[in-house]
Amino acid sequence: MEASTVYYTDFRCPVGTSLTDKLRRLCIAAGIKNIDMEGKFVAIKMHFGELGNLAYLRPNYAKVVADLCKEQGGMPFLTDCNTLYPGSRKNALEHLTCAQLNGFWPMTTGCQVIIADGLRGTDEVEVPVPNGEYCKTAKIGRAIMDADIFISLSHFKGHESTGFGGAIKNIGMGCGSRAGKMEQHASGHPAVQEDLCRGCHRCAKECGSDAISYNEKNKAVIDQDKCKGCGRCIGACNFDAIYALCDSANEMLDRKMAEYAAAVCHDRPTFHISLVQDISPNCDCHGENDAPILPDIGMFASFDPVALDQACADACLNAAPLPNSQLGQNLATPGWNCHHDNFKDSNPNIEWKATLEQAEKVGMGTRAYTLKKD
């Protein structure tokens, strides 16, 4: 496959310019105006940040992208899907409140926010995975698949399970419904935390496989042989008593995530933007953000999310670690087994290259790229 073009700009701003100006110019240089958006719904997929985390992308960046879409006649909306774990984004009401508290609402972003998989995280579409090896279909939030055009706006940072979180993670994991996230993280089966179960029987009413019964203490019990892994019981429980069995090894998670991302992007116009700044060691899903492991690097954009992630990863690998950080502390530890890899030296139990390998294998894009500085 021919190398893809990735466009890049740094964060330097002479007097009279701004970062939002630079992002706008970058998107235009990378070709966003070549997409026919007239009268079309445009999903702008991003992460609104968990409450307490301050490393997520500012809403000002989202407004730049939304304004460009509207200038081209598009109807943009910001979107994300509900989380699998308990937190401030596990259902649409709390998710919208979290987004608003973190600054995402029409006055700041220029468009509406829609939680793509609905109130309980169960409003999904099963989408075929092109050339899928680990997943034949992907469970994707309905509003994302209803959009005519898909744009990812990603905060590129470290990640404790996948090495880094960039475009592919934002798309693959982020667009999965709660059941889709469970399939990626696990064998696809949930379990019950008995002390949280209230015995309300709501989960059993939602189960289409007759897999849930109740023990002598009126606590839910899931028959794993009957369970189909649809995840509706997780959405049904108001008390966070049902959770996913996170038994997938990190490499399997990486590969499933890449296949989910390929399903989202297949057969429609897409465009991808990543900002490599506030490079925290872990996911923005945390309710905190540790000190950045690397200095701010720049903004990247491309039609190819695989090339985009590879370019961002390479830039991070070539950056100097910051001393007062998880990465810097690890490297300064006597006897540390240095991997000469900023992601792996920050979180040693990861295999980040598997994501890019699988994404390329299923035809989502190429790791080969040409970098053009705007």
Where are these regions (language model features)?
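Extended, low-polarity segments enriched in aliphatic/aromatic residues
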Residues: 2-61, 71-80, 85-374
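Terminal amphipathic helices with adjacent charged low-complexity linkers/tails
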Residues: 66-67
